Structure formats: C-alpha cells, structure tokens
Amino acid sequence: DIGISQRGAVNIKLIDAPGCYSLAASSMEEEVARDQICDPQADGVIVVCDGTCLERNLILVLQILKHRNDVVICINLMDQVRKRGLAIDTKKLSQILGVQVVSTESSEKKLIKKNLSDAVIKLTEREGTYERTSGYDPDLLKDPDEIAAQAQEIAAGVVIRDNEKEDTSIKI
C-alpha cells in the first residue's frame, strides 16, 4: 500500500505495483500485482504510465482492459515528454481506449496526488456499468504479439513530435 486517504465519502486505498509491465507474471511480485489488478473486488484500477515510454506501458493497459474497464490511465512525466519535443494527445488516447486519461508532471508531488485523487473520483462518478472478469484469465492474453502491435499503433497515433503539431500561424 502507498496510502489510504479519503475524498468526500470515498475511502481510497492505493496499492503500488512498480515495475509491472505485463499481466503475464514472471516473478512472485508480478503475480501479486497481477492478482490485485485483476481482483474483481477492487472498485477500479488507476494505471500510472511513464509518458516517456508510452508504448511499453500501453501493453499493460491493453491487457488490463481485457480484464476490466473500470480503469483510469494517468500519464506521468509529461514535463519530460515536452523536454523531448513530444506531446501526448490524452483526449485521443481516452477516445481510443474508452477510459478516462489524466496527466501529471514528474516534479510536482502535490499535483500528482491531486490528479490521482481526481482519477479516483472519475472512477466513482462514471455512469454506466463496468465489465470485469472473475480474476486473471490467461486465455485473454494468448497473443502477446497482437497486443504489442496494438500498443505500437496506438502510441504512434497519440504521440506527437513538435514538428508534427498543426501549424496555426498565419502566413503573410
């Protein structure tokens, strides 16, 4: 656990699963993380993705979305993304994945906590029903190459280089 807090009437328990890049666990730590992520008793999952290597993180996101859709994606290190001359279209990413996407800066710890709290509120306020499996189902991850290709395609569609941004200047 990295923290328990309260936001209004909502009790929030955050569990950190660092270094988890796939639900196909290869260590005991990854198995524990996977089981917590896929636990149908959990009210939702916030996946914190490193914006500087979005494609790798999208593999885990896509695997999780095969198991449940009560997910919020938090793209972290957006300041580092900008330093590299890149941008991430979080609105487009949200549309593609069908879940909320928020972003945070690596240098602003208070803002990170606030954005994570906002992500939890978005989970609790979402209308409609959530779909969840009854736990981890390895059959949903039979084709890792397909998931990796999908992650690559999504990343290519939402990561924008500075020189690819739309030029809205008026030419005289």
How should these model regions be labeled?
Residues 3-9, 31-102:
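Conserved C-terminal guanine-recognition region of P-loop GTPase G domains, centered on the G4
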Residues 11-28, 51:
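Switch II (G3) loop of P-loop NTPases
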Residues 13, 25, 29-32, 56-60, ...:
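Helical mechanochemical/support elements of P-loop NTPase systems and associated helical scaffolds
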Residues 16, 33, 172:
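Conserved RecA-like P-loop NTPase ATPase core
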Residues 18, 135-139:
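Short hinge/gating elements
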Residues 79-132:
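Canonical P-loop GTPase G-domain recognition
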Residues 118-125, 140-160:
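Extended, hydrophilic extramembrane loops/domains of integral membrane proteins
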Residues 156-170:
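Short, membrane-interfacial amphipathic segments enriched in basic
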